[in-house]
């Protein structure tokens, strides 16, 4: 019940999908991303549902993603009743048409990694996709009131990540001090996801 700060480090190697070589190991694809800032609306530490929803909507639009194809959402979820309640409200406004959306947060396992919180969630979900498993979030105590009787359900146990023919696809939210909001659409890599390379392009040596 409340923010539990912790420390950690994480790193990713990013590469354009068109530059992926045959047989190269790819852990996931960033299909869409959205950023917003609502810091002027309330205050440094006060979140705003509409600002968070803006970032979510931008991420979906940037990747031309149908929200109905999102199969799991990794929440920011600092563990405060006010902040988590606002986040649930923003998620429900954007993903309202989903009949059932599993949600969770790495912070229940590690605490709040502050500057690494979002990146750690990306690592968590790429690993979950590789294992074809919905990752569990430990639940201890009463479920947040705003989650009850909603389409959002905390994924409290390990389960097979089933799909209906398409790739595994998830969303990640990460919010910072001062009203900075980020939302990412992550997709499991499949060889068919890789676009064809432009064979007409050739690297030329730099002039002496």
Predicted segments with their positions:
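Condensing-enzyme catalytic core of the thiolase-fold
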Residues: 1-208
């Amino acid at each position: 019940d409340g923010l539990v700060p912790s420390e950690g480090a994480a790193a990713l190697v990013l590469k354009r999908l068109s530059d992926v070589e045959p047989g190269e190991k790819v852990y996931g694809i960033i299909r869409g991303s959205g950023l917003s800032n609502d810091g002027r609306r309330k205050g440094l530490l006060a979140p705003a549902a509409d600002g968070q929803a803006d970032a979510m909507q931008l991420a979906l639009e940037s990747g031309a993603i149908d929200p109905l194809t999102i199969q799991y959402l990794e929440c920011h979820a600092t563990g405060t009743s006010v902040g988590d309640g606002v986040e649930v409200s923003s998620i429900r406004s954007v993903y309202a048409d989903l009949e059932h959306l599993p949600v969770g947060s790495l912070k229940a396992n590690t605490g709040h990694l502050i500057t690494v919180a979002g990146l750690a969630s990306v690592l968590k979900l790429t690993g979950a996709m590789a294992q074809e498993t919905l990752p569990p979030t430990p639940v201890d105590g009463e479920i947040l009131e705003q989650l009850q009787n909603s389409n959002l359900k905390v994924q409290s146990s390990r389960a097979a990540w089933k799909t209906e023919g398409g790739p595994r696809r998830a969303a990640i939210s990460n919010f910072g001090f001062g009203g900075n909001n980020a939302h990412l659409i992550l997709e499991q890599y499949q060889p068919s996801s890789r676009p064809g390379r432009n064979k007409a392009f050739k690297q030329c040596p730099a002039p002496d």
